[in-house]
Swiss-Prot record:
Localization terms from the record: Cytoplasm
A GO biological-process term: glucose 6-phosphate metabolic process
Active site: 355 (proton donor), 386, 514
HAMAP family per record: G6P_isomerase
Originating organism: Citrobacter koseri (strain ATCC BAA-895 / CDC 4225-83 / SGSC4696)
Reaction it catalyzes: alpha-D-glucose 6-phosphate = beta-D-fructose 6-phosphate
Name of the molecule in the record: Glucose-6-phosphate isomerase
Family: Belongs to the GPI family.
Cellular-component GO terms for this entry: cytosol
Length: 549
């Protein structure tokens, strides 16, 4: 990957001038001038997904200039580098190959002179055999009973992805009850343990190194709870499995290393649901549905790696995001799925985007003088409409939004889905076109009221509009289409990082807090006053000690 400051390209300078021309142009103007705007600014994927980006403050000239930026920063070369196994995560000297985990074409992918696909396929086969034994009831707990509950213990990428997917694919789930524990707050594990039976519970401990503080603290608490009933350490092997590469530590914990499922250093945590970390997904929906999830992602991988940038969906969405973040000063993006099963999707890509592109140092090691990753947030519709849409519609901040919905619901109860989708369609229309003062006044006249007598309220009912949105309409949320949707966002994030000249696949920002916590932890072991930190931290620790006494 090349190290190119995007602001030094001629395309960036052209975009800056173009912004001066576009900043006062409204979305309503753009639609008024072009009756075919939807056709020109939308695209389908596999007849399963429609991406409508017409309600954005862009023209064909905007997109052309953004494409020029992608060319000048060598996006095509960056894509090739990732897919070919080059070590593009240079700060950790690692390849970035989550795409290999879902490489259903099974074409060789070489890392350090070795094809990784045989090992990928071997772990998949091992997960298949293990999951089928659990799901079928063939696997028995220490009292001879079949497993009824699975508890995934992990944090970050070892939790967010599997939790999001198992929730999104609930219509496909089997009889096993799934639970996820991530927080080191003892409340999280305690509340889950209240719901499960040690005789019929399987724990998955998801930690590559088997040293992650939060995960191992929870794992040891789960083990202690289990042994308080089982009373024999040999029974741990029937109720615990590991998603890890540290065979020594796994064995010392009491887990049979035959039930340790590996992944590799070229699998980043926030891109790991496709790996052994996805074992909880397989246990929830079955191996065949997991393969469909992989296949959907692989289909998007092929689209991303082979489609020209002008028609490439992840690239288009990435470029539009850069346009708003760097030229309009939009600091956030909202992800708004109109599907209750997708209630963790925004949280998943909050990590996916902010941990990937939340960087202020470029690939040359210099502080950037432009915007990198946006703040990502969101909630399912229509809940969000009754919470924060007020700010999106009438606030002082521009918040570009992605609206996501399935055309076909898994729960066709009376007219629920039509009402849900009517809101989905209405919100993007309202955000784009707003409501003028004239329309507000006419509405009062239609009600037999004199607008001049209501001047005190009219301004508050005006909507400026011109708020940008993308609409992503899926035919139905299936394992395949969900896989494609996740990969769409993954590649959008990669594209933005490549163009913005940052390292997307490390996360050094999580380290300092962990180091300081490890230093502070021993200081909390007694009641002595602390004076080794700044006055604020000292004051907080000492008040904590006083109150806990």
């Amino acid at each position: 990957m090349k190290n190119i400051n995007p602001t030094q390209t001629s395309a960036w300078q052209a975009l800056q001038k173009h912004y001066d021309d576009m900043k006062d142009v409204t979305i309503a103007d753009l639609f008024a001038k072009d009756s075919d705007r939807f056709t020109r600014f939308s695209a389908t994927f596999d007849d399963l997904m429609l991406v409508d980006f017409s309600k954005n403050r862009i023209t064909e000239e905007t997109l052309a200039k953004l494409q020029d930026l992608a060319k000048e920063t060598d996006l095509a070369g960056a894509i090739k580098s990732m897919f070919s196994g080059e070590k593009i995560n240079r700060t950790e000297d690692r390849a970035v190959l989550h795409v290999a985990l879902r490489n259903r074409s099974n074409t060789p992918i070489i890392v350090d002179g070795k094809d990784v696909m045989p090992e990928v396929n071997a772990v998949l086969e091992k997960m298949k055999a293990f999951s089928e034994a659990i799901i079928s009831g063939q696997w028995k707990g220490y009292t001879g009973k079949a497993i009824t509950d699975v508890v995934n213990i992990g944090i970050g990428g070892s939790d967010l992805g599997p939790f999001m997917v198992t929730e999104a694919l609930r219509p496909y789930k089997n009889h096993l009850n799934m639970h996820f524990v991530s927080n080191v707050d003892g409340t999280h594990i305690a509340e889950v343990l209240k719901k499960v039976n040690p005789e019929t519970t399987l724990f998955l401990v998801a930690s590559k190194t088997f040293t992650t503080q939060e995960t191992m603290t929870n794992a040891h608490s789960a083990r202690d709870w289990f042994l308080s009933t089982a009373n024999d350490e040999k029974h741990v092997a029937k109720h615990f499995a590991a998603l890890s590469t540290n065979a020594k530590a796994v064995g010392e914990f009491g887990i049979d290393t035959a039930n340790m499922f590996e992944f590799w250093d070229w699998v980043g945590g926030r891109y790991s649901l496709w790996s052994a970390i996805g074992l909880s997904i397989i246990l929830s929906v079955g191996f065949d549905n997991f393969v469909e999830l992989l296949s959907g992602a692989h289909a998007m991988d092929k689209h991303f790696s082979t489609t020209p940038a002008e028609k490439n969906l992840p690239v288009l969405l990435a470029l539009i995001g850069i346009w708003y973040n760097n030229f309009f000063g939009a600091e956030t993006e909202a992800i708004l799925p109109y599907d209750q099963y997708m209630h963790r999707f925004a949280a998943y890509f909050q990590q996916g985007n902010m941990e990937s592109n939340g960087k202020y140092v470029d690939r040359n090691g210099n502080a950037v003088d432009y915007q990198t990753g946006p703040i990502i947030w969101g909630e399912p519709g229509t809940n969000g409409q009754h919470a924060f849409y007020q700010l999106i519609h009438q606030g002082t901040k521009m918040v570009p939004c992605d609206f996501i919905a399935p055309a076909i619901t898994h729960n066709p109860l009376s007219d629920h889905h039509q009402k849900l989708l009517s809101n989905f369609f209405a919100q993007t229309e309202a955000l784009a076109f707003g409501k003028s003062r004239e329309v507000v006044e006419q509405e009062y006249r239609d009600q037999g009221k004199d607008p001049s007598q209501l001047e005190h309220v009219v301004p508050f009912k005006v909507f400026e509009g011109n708020r940008p949105t993308n609409s992503i309409l899926l035919r139905e949320i299936t394992p395949f289409s969900l896989g494609a949707l996740i990969a769409l966002y993954e590649h959008k994030i990669f594209t933005q990082g490549a163009i913005l000249n940052i390292f997307t696949f490390d996360q050094w920002g999580v380290e300092l807090g962990k180091q300081l916590a490890n230093r502070i932890l021993p200081e909390l072991g007694d009641d002595k006053a602390i004076s080794s930190h700044d006055s604020s931290t000292n004051g907080l620790i000492n008040r904590y000690k006083a109150w806990r006494a």
